[in-house]
Each structure stands twice: as structure tokens, then as C-alpha cells.
């Protein structure tokens, strides 16, 4: 189990008129928190379980031009708006340990549940999109332990690519693990995470955006 902070920067466009997250909506780097817990066991036929909850929120103010179209109702005039983008999600992953030695390899499937929205709120007009959805992702994780050092390196990813929806969420990290108590190990983690989201008129949603940056986490293992 553990938790940390991800310093994520948004890039790309959302909406039917390709509204840029940086230059138009003035969204910038934000610290977003995450927590996770994993349960592993020695029973061969039963998968291991990992659950992670990730906050992904950005807020700001912007001046949008007439014709700006987030979800079907273009702004009729230039207007100052409050901007909110929320991609908060929870992952439930079932996986098997294929290798568990100096090299670790886990493979499985993730159910990702988004609970968020995107909105532009002005004095005379507002637009909002609910970003509530559950989807399956392929999951993989590979790691290498450096013997006698407490150091290890890992790469993990969740991925899906179907007709109207593409999501690639990967992270690379280095962990230093040490004994905290006789029955408790602690790990300090430094990593880099990138999440790419492409939607092509999926339930009237359109996006081509990425969110990436460094993260730091603390892990406890019993």
C-alpha cells in the first residue's frame, strides 16, 4: 500500500473546436494525489489484486472566443469563463505474476472508472461534459531488482485502442526499499507518468490530450 503526488501537466485539445488546454484554457501543472493498495498471495490460479485511486483536477480562468464549442453549444460571443477539467479515476486490476525473481513480470487486466467532468462556466453561457465511464484496459508491469542495494526499476502500463477510444497510461520508476520494522518494509519511489487520451466522437466527446510529469510516492509492504 502507499500513496504519492503526481506533478501533471496537460497538453493537447478537447472539444469539437479543438480547444487547447494550455494556450486557450490556461491550464498548467498541478499536484495531484494518488493512493494504492495491492494484495498478493501464493494461490496459483487466483489473480492478485491492485486498486489505485488517482486525482486529476485542473482549474483556471480563460477568455474564450465566439464559436468555442466544447460539446455542441458554441459560445455566441467572447466570454470570460471559469475552467474545470476533472479526470479523476479508480483502477481495479487483476493480474498474475509471470516472473518473480531478479526480473519481475506481471500481466493482467484493469477496469478503470472515470468520475469527472470538463466545464466552461461563463456569466451568460456554460458548457459541460460528464466524464463518467468504465472501461477495460490491458495491464503489464516489468521490473528489475539490483541485488544487495535495495534498488529496483519498474515500467508499468495500462492500454486500450479501439475504434473511437485510445488510452495509453504508462509510468517508469525507481524505488529504494529498506526495512522499517521487522515485519514492515518501506519504499521511496521516484517516477515519471504519462497518460495519453484520444476520443473521436465517443458519446459526443472529442479529445486529443496528454497529461504527464514526475511523481513521488511512499510504499509500505507487510
Task: Label each residue range with its predicted role.
Residues 1-58:
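Short glycine/proline- and aromatic-enriched beta-strand/turn motifs that initiate or cap beta-hairpins
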Residues 3-9, 53-59, 98, 111-117, ...:
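Transmembrane beta-strands of outer-membrane beta-barrel pores
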Residues 1, 35, 47-51, 92, ...:
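Transmembrane beta-strands of outer-membrane beta-barrel proteins
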Residues 42-48, 99-105, 146-151, 179-186:
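Short loop/turn motifs that connect adjacent beta-strands in outer-membrane beta-barrel proteins
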Residues 11-25, 59-83, 115-131, 200-207:
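Flexible, solvent-exposed loop segments that connect beta-strands
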Residues 91, 112, 125-159, 169:
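Detector for outer-membrane/organellar transmembrane beta-barrel domains
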Residues 17-19, 29-33, 86-90, 103, ...:
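Residues that define the transmembrane beta-barrel architecture of outer-membrane proteins
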Residues 40, 210-222:
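Outer-membrane beta-barrel "beta-signal"
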Amino acid at each position: 500500500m502507499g500513496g504519492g503526488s503526481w506533478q501533471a501537466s496537460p497538453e493537447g485539445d478537447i472539444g469539437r473546436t479543438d480547444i487547447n488546454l494550455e494556450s486557450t484554457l490556461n491550464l498548467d501543472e498541478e499536484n495531484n494525489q494518488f493512493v494504492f493498495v495491492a494484495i498478493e498471495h501464493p494461490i496459483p490460479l487466483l489473480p492478485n489484486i491492485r486498486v489505485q485511486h488517482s486525482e486529476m483536477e485542473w482549474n483556471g480562468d480563460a477568455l474564450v472566443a465566439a464559436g468555442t464549442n466544447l460539446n455542441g453549444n458554441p459560445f455566441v460571443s467572447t466570454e470570460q469563463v471559469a475552467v474545470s477539467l476533472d479526470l479523476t479515476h479508480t483502477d481495479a486490476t487483476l493480474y498474475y505474476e509471470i516472473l518473480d525473481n531478479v526480473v519481475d513480470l506481471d500481466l493482467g487486466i484493469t477496469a478503470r472508472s472515470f468520475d469527472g467532468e470538463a466545464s466552461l462556466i461563463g456569466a451568460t453561457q456554460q458548457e459541460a461534459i460528464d466524464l463518467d465511464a468504465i472501461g477495460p484496459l490491458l495491464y503489464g508491469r516489468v521490473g528489475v531488482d539490483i541485488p544487495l542495494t535495495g534498488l529496483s526499476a519498474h515500467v508499468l502500463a495500462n492500454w486500450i485502442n479501439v475504434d473511437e477510444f485510445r488510452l495509453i497510461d504508462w509510468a517508469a520508476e525507481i524505488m529504494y526499499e529498506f526495512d522499517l520494522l521487522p515485519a514492515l518494509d518501506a519504499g521511496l519511489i521516484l517516477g515519471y507518468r504519462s497518460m495519453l487520451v484520444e476520443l473521436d466522437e465517443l458519446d459526443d466527446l472529442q479529445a486529443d490530450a496528454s497529461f504527464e510529469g514526475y511523481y513521488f510516492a511512499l510504499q509500505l509492504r507487510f
